[in-house]
Regions:
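Extracellular/periplasmic juxtamembrane helices and adjacent flexible linkers that interface
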Residues: 1-30, 39-40, 307-378
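N-terminal segment of the mature folded domain
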Residues: 36-188, 368-378
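Bilobed "Venus flytrap"/periplasmic-binding protein-like clamshell domains
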Residues: 53-59, 199-217
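Periplasmic-binding protein-like
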Residues: 127-137, 233-240, 281-312
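Short helix-loop capping/hinge motifs at secondary-structure junctions, enriched
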Residues: 143-148, 216-222, 309-313
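Bilobed periplasmic-binding protein/Venus flytrap-like ligand-binding cleft at the lobe interface
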Residues: 153-173, 192-199, 303-340
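Alpha-helix-centered segments that form part of catalytic cores
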Residues: 166-200, 232-248
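Ligand-binding pocket segment of bilobal, Venus flytrap-like solute-binding proteins
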Residues: 206-290
Length: 378
């Protein structure tokens, strides 16, 4: 009898210990931040908000295979505008169990850090630029030729460069000139540069930064100071508002422009046309579309901002040579970790070292631009 009682109590103790261990494991998992749970094979699932132009890339079957088999990570990618994601309060990010942000520029990263949000994540916060893509303007061939005839665009080695962005802005856009003034029949109407909404999306904000540098500082290679920016915000706001309704993300803005064959000018990333060619157009270059490289342009970094320890795996994974190769050959992202030969089937792309570049403005100027676009405080 005593022996059976002993066994009974031992069983009870065993059950209690098992329950305590189970509860402890659950609590530790919850405290880990992003709510990332390991699958039966040990793979960690993380949730990441990122720019829409990276959605096809991160969901590429081969990329997902490398992430899972080599790095033990699976990504739930939720497309969200760069400036929208970095302005989400830290408490809300934690409540929604977000493990990382993946905006499309160092400017968006600066907003997250300078606002103090990054500090809320302590040592789990890490930032690393893993991909790059220069800001470009897309044009239909007739519009590009009209700009070339006006001395605004030059063609060198089969690549179109905007060599006089100031002339384009001050002699055509700001005065409200029409495409007919450039002897262009398609498109009709005023000369505009369309973009995604700069209040939420990085490609639109980068266009605004280029416009600001050109109109404010007098030297496009010199980012505008706060004083210069303040004096020119109204001009930039007018250029943006002239577009009318804007898409909230870079990807939807590009897809609308190319599918509807809108013509004219669209600001975006170099990779968007290259990605369209490989993933949507069976490797064929769409007829009648030209990529224009502003001189200078801004190279958009695509930094991963980790909010939990588990998300740090993603940085190492995207820096993997095999994934960097896929990023370029299938999705047109220039590598953020090493130098690759810039050769893309059917398209002439300028080598990185030959592209004339300028820097984005500092945080104070970015904040002025955001306040202007979001709250109309210009």
């Amino acid at each position: 009898m005593k022996k059976s009682k002993g066994l009974f109590y031992a069983g009870i103790v065993g059950i209690v210990v098992a329950l305590v261990i189970g509860v402890a494991v659950i609590m530790m998992s919850k405290r880990s931040g992003g709510g990332n749970a390991a699958t039966h094979d040990g793979t960690v699932k993380i949730t990441c908000y990122g720019g829409s132009e990276k959605e096809d890339f991160i969901n590429d079957p081969q990329v997902k295979k490398i992430l899972r088999e080599k790095y033990g990570v699976e990504v739930n990618f939720i497309a969200k505008g760069s400036y929208k994601q970095v302005q989400i309060p830290a408490d809300e990010l934690k409540a929604n169990k977000v493990d990382c942000l993946w905006p499309s520029s160092a400017s968006a990263q600066a907003v997250f850090e300078e606002s103090g949000s990054s500090k809320a994540f302590g040592n789990d916060y890490q930032a690393a630029s893993v991909l790059q893509s220069p800001e470009v303007l897309y044009a239909n061939t007739e519009a590009a030729e009209g700009l070339k005839n006006a001395g605004i665009v030059q063609v060198r080695d089969n690549v179109y460069f905007i060599v006089d962005f100031r002339k384009l802005l001050e002699e055509y856009l700001l005065p409200g000139k029409s495409w007919a003034d450039l002897a262009v029949a398609v498109p009709s109407g005023p000369v505009l540069i369309n973009s995604s909404d700069p209040a939420t999306s990085n490609s639109g904000m980068t266009l605004a930064q280029l416009e600001l540098a050109t109109t404010a500082s007098g030297n496009p290679y010199q980012p505008a100071s706060t004083a210069q920016a303040g004096a020119s915000l109204a001009k930039v706001k007018a250029l943006i508002e002239a577009q009318g309704l804007m898409r909230t993300g870079s990807n939807s803005a590009f897809e609308q422009w190319i599918i509807q064959q809108t013509g004219g000018l669209l600001a975006g990333y170099e990779n968007q046309l290259l990605q369209w060619i490989t993933t949507r157009n069976a490797g064929a270059v769409p007829a009648g579309i030209v990529t224009l490289y502003p001189e200078p342009t801004i190279f958009n970094d695509h930094p991963i901002l980790t909010l939990t320890a588990a998300a740090k795996k993603l940085i190492a994974a995207i820096e993997d040579d095999a994934i960097q190769d896929i990023a370029w050959t299938r999705y047109g992202f220039r590598p953020g970790t090493r130098v690759l030969e810039q050769v893309f089937p059917g398209v002439t792309v300028p080598p990185t070292h030959t592209i004339k570049k300028t820097q984005a403005p500092g945080y104070a100027v970015i904040k002025l631009l955001l306040d202007c676009f979001v709250t109309n405080h210009c």
